[in-house]
Design a protein with these regions (language model features):
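Iron-sulfur cluster-binding cysteine motifs and their immediate structural context
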Residues: 1, 10, 15, 19-42, ...
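Signature of N-terminal electron-transfer/Fe-S-associated modules in redox systems
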Residues: 1-6, 130
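Short leucine-rich amphipathic alpha-helices used at interfaces
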Residues: 5-6, 12-13, 56
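A diffuse structural propensity rather than consistent per-protein peaks
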Residues: 6-7, 257
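Well-ordered alpha-helical segments embedded in enzymatic catalytic cores
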Residues: 8-12, 183-186
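Iron-sulfur cluster-binding electron-transfer modules in prokaryotic oxidoreductases
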Residues: 32-265
């Protein structure tokens, strides 16, 4: 309708987790994912958030896509975390809540996962790129390291460019389309030059965005085709493993598997 977004609209859109269950259950097949993406961008463009909210979102949007800076921020927040009760008593409940999210122990960076090419073990089956990501590479670097070990053992050469960092998913879900598209283009450039058979993702939320690059950049004449090609190559690591001939399990090990909502819908 052209009407600027208001606080009620912003709150409603902000509360959407993009689990995409609505798309699975909608009998009419409405693409709510794209509707919500457009709504987030519209809210960001037309609604002036309260000062603290603007500051918080700006800090998160600048810090979290940069792994080095995000790690330093976590260290600083960990040092300040004992002050959470003080912040709560002074009425700064949001700051107290953020301090409460700081990990009890800071993850140690893995040696495996640094930029470079990891050779396949045995006969080479193909060449894949691995998105190291921004937040996950700091909070749980062991996931990417384990993925590299597994893929190379299965015969795949793994390329870690280290230059794409954030794929744009984080700022895309904040409605910051200019930043998100710039990060998407940077990632596309890296993976296109790497000439890989697949782009492996270990964070399903990032995978959802990369698989949508073709739509996000459909009006960009310089990137539309390349974006579509990268979207077609994007695979969650679990999807990619389902395509492989895996050896029989040794037995004696029971595992629990959590299927993320963005993988189910």
């Amino acid at each position: 309708s052209g009407r600027p977004a208001d606080a009620r609209t912003a709150l409603h859109i902000d509360r959407c987790l993009s689990c995409l269950s609505c798309m699975t259950t909608c009998p009419s097949g409405v693409n709510y994912m794209h509707l919500v993406d457009e709504a987030r961008a519209y809210v960001e463009e037309t609604y002036e958030r309260p000062l603290f909210e603007r500051l918080l979102r700006n800090v998160l949007a600048y810090t979290m896509p940069r792994p080095g800076l995000f790690r330093l921020s976590l260290i600083g927040a960990k040092i300040a975390s004992p002050l959470a009760p003080v912040a709560r008593s002074l009425g700064a409940t949001r700051i107290a809540a953020l301090l409460g999210l700081v990990p009890k122990r800071m993850p140690v960076p893995e040696r495996i996962g640094q930029p470079g090419t990891y050779r396949a073990t045995g006969q080479k089956k193909g060449r894949v790129a691995l998105l190291m990501g921004c937040v996950q590479s700091v909070l749980d670097p062991g996931i990417n390291a384990a993925t590299i070990r597994l893929l190379t053992r299965l015969g795949y050469e793994v390329v870690v460019s280290g230059e794409e960092a954030c794929c744009g998913s984080l700022t895309h879900h904040m409605g910051l389309e200019h930043d998100a598209l710039a990060r998407a283009r940077r990632s596309i450039d890296q993976w296109t030059r790497a000439d890989v058979d697949a782009v492996i993702v270990t964070a399903s939320g990032c995978g959802t965005t990369i698989k949508d690059y073709g739509h996000m950049l459909r009006h960009d004449a310089a990137y539309a085709e390349a974006a579509k090609a990268i979207s077609a190559k994007a695979k969650d690591v679990t999807e990619f493993l389902m395509m492989q001939e895996l050896p029989d399990a040794q037995g004696g090990l029971r595992l629990a598997y959590h299927s993320a909502c963005s993988m189910q819908h």
